[in-house]
UniProtKB/Swiss-Prot annotation:
The active site is at residue 409. Its cofactor is NAD(+). This is Urocanate hydratase. It comes from Xanthomonas euvesicatoria pv. vesicatoria (strain 85-10). The gene is hutU. HAMAP family: HutU. It comes from the Bacteria. GO terms for cellular component: cytoplasm. Transmembrane segments: none annotated. GO terms for biological process: L-histidine catabolic process to glutamate and formamide; L-histidine catabolic process to glutamate and formate. NAD(+) binds at residues 51-52, 129, 175-177, 195, 262-266, 272-273, 321, 491. Binds 1 NAD(+) per subunit. Gene3D superfamilies: Urocanase like domains, Urocanase superfamily.
Amino acid sequence: MTRHDATRVIRAATGTTLTAKSWLTEAPLRMLMNNLDPDVAEHPQELVVYGGIGRAARDWESFDAIVAALTRLDEDQTLLVQSGKPVGVFRTHADAPRVLIANSNLVPRWANWDHFSELDQKGLAMYGQMTAGSWIYIGAQGIVQGTYETFVEMGRQHYAGNLAGKWLFTGGLGGMGGAQPLAAVMAGASCLVVECRRSSIDMRLRTGYLDTWTDSLDEALRLIEESCTAKKPLSVGLLGNVADVLDELLLRGIKPDLLTDQTSAHDPVNGYLPQGWSVEEWDAKRVSARKEVEAAARESMANHIRAMLTFHALGVPTVDYGNNLRQMALEAGIDNAFDFPGFVPAYIRPLFCRGIGPFRWVALSGDPDDIAKTDAKVKELIPDDAHLHRWLDMAAEKIAFQGLPARICWVGLGDRHRLGLAFNAMVRSGELKAPVVIGRDHLDSGSVASPNRETEAMADGSDAVSDWPLLNALLNTASGATWVSLHHGGGVGMGFSQHAGMVIVCDGSEAADKRIERVLWNDPATGVMRHADAGYAIATDCAKEKGLDLPGILR
């Protein structure tokens, strides 16, 4: 089992020449490779895409075997991938998914980091995060609009919709956290973000997600103060330990205007630098002394949450951004760790009730002009949504593509399938140079059960019911998605979530029209269904408006 290979540099093919037998198998092949592009992945030579140890394949032998299988797969065959390893090719039919993926799933009693790590070290499992092991990661852009929407809503609720002259404090510049500084600036706020790895800071600078950096807190605060005074949003990366910096801010009596965190706290061994440790010591002991690392990280997380709770008590709008930091602190003895809310119940759930979530697409041509054309098509088909148009304009101006050109765009039930059909028609007519793939994050309205994040504080108490993502995966399979994935532990770690993903290819064919219409209607409809079942009036109204047939829910 080879998990580190310094000789490997993987990039997706572009253009219209196929390596596989059809676009329906070329697409997952390119997206797998795109996940490991050095401009996309956090640690590509270790197959790590983002989120601690979120991998695209179990090991390099499995990666090679997946590539070989996709290259030879026929139009009526389906490849099964078990925790990053290809385990079977079976005869199905042309409208069935070409790939079915299950990553990190464990029987609930054994669904914890200790047991998973035993399996992982034996080469029997792989942590797929959400979009790492499901081959639809698009770099930090994948979360930037959701983060932007959250920050905008924080501004609406706490500062009358105006974040000019305000600043956000946060931690983490990894694959997910790296979206925070750009999202904050887009929302009108300055951002001070602490990151312990210089390489992560450098990547965000290189890709345009971060404006500047320093290793001096005094300098960082000076830059933030100047930007707020001038009301010119600026993002500043600070090299350091976020828990240490929060303690220092409290000592100095300095309060941010908004507070959150996106370190990889969900993984106490691989995702969080203990206070007082160097990165080099941490990296060495993550292999040689895992229990020591975990204990030290949990103690630091408890300190981190204590500081956040203090700021919360001082009136600073404080929110958990879904990395399970509160849970880790609770287990470390901080009984009131959940005194401040998660971002979904606080700011995002009304969108989920209407099936609105992180719709994304990728141009397999590799040509940014294809994304420009699809951006224009979105504006044409959704002409009256000024907020969406503003987002697309900002994205075109400010977001640098990582790997294959892509776009993220939060739209919901009734719009997703219209956009998919329009994109497919653009491929058919030749307006787009090659097919596009449409997917989403597993963080969506109907595809995840995560009591400390997406399904926190559900109205009916159904936070932990995970039938919903299973039904979502089954329905997307039956509807004809090109590949479907079912994962465990993404975002918040082992034992705390189950979630499903789907991707569908717009290859320009009439057969694709039928699959697109089914998948891109049914997928967001499951989110409306799930929230209607929980008793949300917004969701029941949406279900009635869209004519959903929900016999046990709408009576």
